[in-house]
């Protein structure tokens, strides 16, 4: 009788262990799937369906982030954290941004921040990294106000979440009508075999009766 009871206990314990392992395996699989989807949701969108960012900078906040907010800013190890452009005095955070419901790339809520489109490449990665920054608000110059002054050979320095540095060299700049931006080109590296970084901001004039600038400036650079 005791032997049967012991066997029953052993069998029950074994079944419980198998069930526990199964639940753990399923849980880990779900976590992995969730992480994958979080990292690839925007990148799964074909570039020809992605629209250029809007120009809500005129209504974006112009309150400068505190020194502490900037210095304590953190992101995942492989994502862009800071952008530094020595020739035009840019030192800013790089926020992670996705797509709006209408297919436009979202933009930062503050004119002193920049935004990395998470459907584009990461620092040093094959393809092109895309970063957007505001040119101004109604009352202040934005982070990319002097972007038009960049010239070929200027450096753009990206600090990643793990503090690894990537230096890109400006190749050229293009200006597009606000409603005719070729996002396939903007989201592609200027040299197919070299990781790229393309920056965008608004330029030109404000369209009468709107808060929309009539042009977009894109700076193309590649990893040095």
Mark where each language-model region is:
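N-terminal Lys/Arg-rich, disordered targeting/topogenic segments
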Residues: 1-18
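Residues marking helix boundaries in flexible regions
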Residues: 7-11, 25, 64
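Hydrophobic H-region at the start of alpha-helical membrane spans
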Residues: 17-30
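Solvent-exposed, non-transmembrane regions of membrane-associated and secreted proteins
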Residues: 27-224
């Amino acid at each position: 009788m005791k032997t049967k009871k012991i066997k029953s206990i052993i069998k029950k314990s074994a079944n419980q262990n198998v069930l526990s392992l199964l639940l753990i395996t399923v849980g880990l699989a779900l976590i992995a799937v969730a992480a994958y989807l979080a990292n690839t949701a925007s990148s799964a969108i074909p570039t020809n369906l992605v629209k250029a960012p809007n120009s809500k900078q005129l209504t974006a906040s112009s309150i400068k982030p505190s020194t502490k907010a900037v210095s304590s800013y953190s992101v995942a190890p492989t994502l862009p954290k800071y952008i530094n452009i020595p020739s035009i005095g840019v030192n800013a955070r790089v926020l992670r941004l996705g797509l709006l419901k209408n297919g436009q790339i979202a933009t930062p809520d503050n004119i002193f921040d920049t935004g990395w489109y998470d459907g584009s490449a990461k620092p040093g990665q094959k393809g092109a990294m895309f970063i957007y920054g505001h040119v101004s608000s109604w009352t202040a110059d934005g982070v990319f106000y002097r972007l038009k002054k960049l010239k070929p050979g200027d450096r753009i320095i990206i600090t990643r979440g793990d503090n690894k540095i990537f230096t890109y060299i400006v190749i050229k700049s293009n200006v597009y009508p606000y409603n005719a931006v070729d996002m396939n080109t903007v989201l592609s590296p200027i040299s197919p075999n070299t990781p790229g970084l393309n920056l965008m901001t608004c330029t030109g004039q404000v369209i009468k009766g709107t808060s929309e600038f009539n042009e977009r400036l894109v700076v193309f650079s590649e990893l040095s």
